[in-house]
UniProtKB/Swiss-Prot annotation:
Cofactor remark from the record: Binds 2 heme b groups non-covalently.
Gene (name only): MT-CYB
Membrane topology value: Multi-pass membrane protein
GO terms of molecular function: metal ion binding; ubiquinol-cytochrome-c reductase activity
Note: Heme 1 (or BL or b562) is low-potential and absorbs at about 562 nm, and heme 2 (or BH or b566) is high-potential and absorbs at about 566 nm.
Subunit structure: The cytochrome bc1 complex contains 11 subunits: 3 respiratory subunits (MT-CYB, CYC1 and UQCRFS1), 2 core proteins (UQCRC1 and UQCRC2) and 6 low-molecular weight proteins (UQCRH/QCR6, UQCRB/QCR7, UQCRQ/QCR8, UQCR10/QCR9, UQCR11/QCR10 and a cleavage product of UQCRFS1). This cytochrome bc1 complex then forms a dimer.
Name assigned to this protein: Cytochrome b
Length: 379
């Protein structure tokens, strides 16, 4: 008799995805982040569900309802901080996952890569809308500034912004619709993640060497289930250290002040995981130019596969590309730092230089290094 996990229509899908899945025998810990992102998503949906039971999406009571969750709801404080810091963990895993994809050439799976970019955009939209919900000062002004960027679109810009706001400023209608979207988008992310996995399993996983691993595969369970559980334990450890010891470390103190449309905070800035894109936006003096640069800073990932000039897939045996990759990482850290600084000298200049460096490395230097390394192989 056939094993039920191989014959049952539903269990068979799980079996082919997580148990009997043929996996390269040499994938490193950098391949853990996919499963960690899945765990983060489930954690965010669960904590978010419990928060939504007590939250009210009304400008008059939103701030009070979040305070009520922290003070009066059983374990409300831990649910709230797990949700807020869980988002930070989500983005740490996301950046690591995308970075691994770029380093090891996983972008050569075009469908998987493009759905990944779509997932990144959707997650960023979800996180932005979630940041507006507590209705603190930074929530309100962040929503005002970021939605206002759409007014840079010629001809339809102003009408589009007012349509999104549901009025002439960020108001009750805006908060209500942001809550509705923030609730539904994680489920769309879940569906996209399933499609992402579907396309990945069509081709099989990449591996650090970048070479085909058809001759050397091992079953996913128990080898990689155990390995993923180790990664999961470390993730939970980091998350709980944040939640229990310094829950407000990554937040903004201004968000503990209720939203006041008549009082602008001295420095309006988004959450830390958007600072690199915010720095690129601010580095261009023109409004439309800044918005385009902001979108392109993420959309540039879509052209990475087209700019691959090397005969090798990953960067494991490509020292020049490795140097450029880590320079790009350092540059992104610099942009993150600049995004949180006031708009004054020398930060403006540093931001502009870091933005130029960011686009130059990806669009110009990486393809050139690939060509140089191809020639070095002939020597």
């Amino acid at each position: 008799m056939t094993n039920i996990r191989k014959s049952h229509p539903l269990i068979k899908i799980v079996n082919e995805s997580f148990i009997d899945l043929p996996t390269p025998s040499n994938i490193s810990a950098w391949w853990n982040f996919g499963s960690l992102l899945g765990v983060c998503l489930v954690l965010q949906i669960l904590t978010g569900l419990f928060l939504a039971m007590h939250y009210t999406s009304d400008t008059a009571t939103a701030f009070s309802s979040v305070t009520h969750i922290c003070r009066d709801v059983n374990y409300g404080w831990i649910i709230r901080y797990m949700h807020a810091n869980g988002a930070s963990m989500f983005f740490i895993c996301l950046f690591m996952h995308v970075g691994r994809g770029m380093y090891y050439g996983s972008y050569t799976f075009p469908e998987t890569w493009n759905i990944g970019i779509l997932l990144l955009f959707t997650t960023m939209a979800t996180a932005f809308m979630g940041y507006v919900l507590p209705w603190g000062q930074m929530s309100f002004w962040g929503a005002t500034v970021i939605t206002n960027l759409l007014s840079a679109i010629p001809y339809i810009g102003t009408s589009l912004v007012e349509w999104i706001w549901g009025g002439f400023s960020v108001n009750k209608a805006t908060l209500t619709r942001f809550f509705a979207f923030h609730f539904i988008l994680p489920f769309i992310i879940l569906a996209l993640a399933a499609i992402h996995l579907l396309f990945l399993h069509e081709t099989g996983s990449n591996n650090p060497s970048g070479m085909t691993s058809d001759t050397d595969k091992i079953p996913f369970h128990p080898y990689y289930t155990i390995k993923d559980i180790l990664g999961l334990l470390l993730l939970i450890l980091m998350l709980m250290l944040l939640v229990l010891f310094s829950p407000d470390l990554l937040g903004d103190p201004d968000n503990y002040t209720p939203a006041n449309p008549l009082n602008t905070p001295p420095h309006i800035k988004p959450e830390w995981y958007f600072l690199f894109a915010y720095a690129i936006l601010r580095s261009i003096p023109n409004k439309l130019g800044g918005v385009l640069a902001l979108i392109l800073s993420i959309l540039i990932l879509a052209v990475v596969p087209l700019l691959h000039t090397s005969k090798q897939r990953g960067m494991m045996f490509r020292p020049i590309s490795q140097c450029l990759f880590w320079l790009l990482v350092a540059d992104l850290l610099a942009l993150t730092w600049i995004g949180g600084q006031p708009v004054e000298y020398p930060f403006i200049t540093i931001g502009q230089l870091a933005s130029i460096t960011y686009f130059s490395i990806i669009l110009i230097l990486m393809p050139i290094s690939g060509i140089i390394e191809n020639h070095l192989l002939k020597w």
